[in-house]
Amino acid sequence: MSLEPTLRDLLHSKLQWIFVGGKGGVGKTTTSCALATLFASTPVHDAVTNTTRPRRVLLISTDPAHNLSDAFSQKFGKTPVPVNGMEETLFAMEVDPTTFTHGGFGAMLGFPGHIATDADAPSPFAALGNILKEAAGTLPGIDELSVFAEILRGVQQLSYDVVIFDTAPTGHTLRLLALPHTLNSTMEKLLSVEGLNTLIQAASAVLSSTTNLGDMSSLMPAFKQWRENVQEVQRQFTDAEKTAFICVCIPEFLSVYETERLVQELMKYDISCDSIVVNQLVLKPSSEPDCRMCNARQKIQSKYLAQIDSLYEDFHVVKMPLLSDEVRGVPALQRFAQFLLEPYDADRHGYIDVCGAAS
């Protein structure tokens, strides 16, 4: 049975983490920004005081191509900045995943100082830490996982009600989703006596046969902390009460193909996903004269819309119209967001321009 073609249910949930992902160029950033304005405009019930209060929302871009600044016509950086016009409720930041991996990797893992890859550290543990950092840095998805683990620790202290991620294109996202499971399995083996001995022998061989690694028992707490961090990320990912993934696509072959691949991977790793946003639909009022180009595009799109409706009949499938211009600034994003809550109807709503006027 088809679900309501809106994202209204999300606004009344207790979700803490929302990921918006899909193929590049399908409108992920516009969708995530519009969704963020919706959450920031919707009060949340405070169980302690039994009253409603403004909801605090953090929007984070982990896409190296960062477009949040363009979407809001405002500059963002690696720390949360209030969004103009919604200063009390909506904050945004753009982070470079590689800086988390290479700049704060030891801290993310919970390594003690003497193996945190400090260049001034006198102990040979510093060299071992560098080896571990370089080895882990080659893992696909480690950049994105580092971001999430760091944010998971920091954001919980900043009193945000919900964090929305504007993610990198599908390939990066799939690696991120798979990594906690892979790392957790690896760490289980590594933390066994045999696994740790193997690591020690390998490290000794690399550093040199004469290097004294000292008391290797101090490594155990560090690796246990790493495993706990990874396991916490995995718990958050797979908790349907806390985490949801929204797939964004357009009605074209490659986008629909990648969406199905993404949905299958989400199911594989037990990550909740029951919402799909289909952008850039050519929809015109019935009173408008025929347009040869419009009819051709509608014919192509209707083919893939039929596939989407068939594949995701138990999803919230939100169908968004192609607009007359780019969606930039809070007013335009809020106008776009209206149709995440209310199904767009060309005869009733007419053409929508970026200023929010219907014609």
Curated annotation (Swiss-Prot):
Keywords on record: ATP-binding, Cytoplasm, Endoplasmic reticulum, Hydrolase, Metal-binding, Nucleotide-binding, Transport, Zinc
Source superkingdom: Eukaryota
First and last residue of the signal peptide: none
Cell compartments where the protein resides: Cytoplasm; Endoplasmic reticulum
Main location: cytoplasm
Coiled-coil regions listed: none
Listed GO MF terms: ATP binding; ATP hydrolysis activity; metal ion binding
Residues holding ATP: 23-30, 252, 279
UniProt-annotated binding residues for Zn(2+): 291, 294
Active site: 63
Physiological role: ATPase required for the post-translational delivery of tail-anchored (TA) proteins to the endoplasmic reticulum. Recognizes and selectively binds the transmembrane domain of TA proteins in the cytosol. This complex then targets to the endoplasmic reticulum by membrane-bound receptors, where the tail-anchored protein is released for insertion. This process is regulated by ATP binding and hydrolysis. ATP binding drives the homodimer towards the closed dimer state, facilitating recognition of newly synthesized TA membrane proteins. ATP hydrolysis is required for insertion.
PANTHER family hit by this protein: ARSENICAL PUMP-DRIVING ATPASE ARSENITE-TRANSLOCATING ATPASE, ATPASE GET3
Family the entry assigns: Belongs to the arsA ATPase family.
Protein name: ATPase ASNA1 homolog
Organism, as annotated: Trypanosoma cruzi (strain CL Brener)
Source lineage: Eukaryota, Discoba, Euglenozoa, Kinetoplastea, Metakinetoplastina
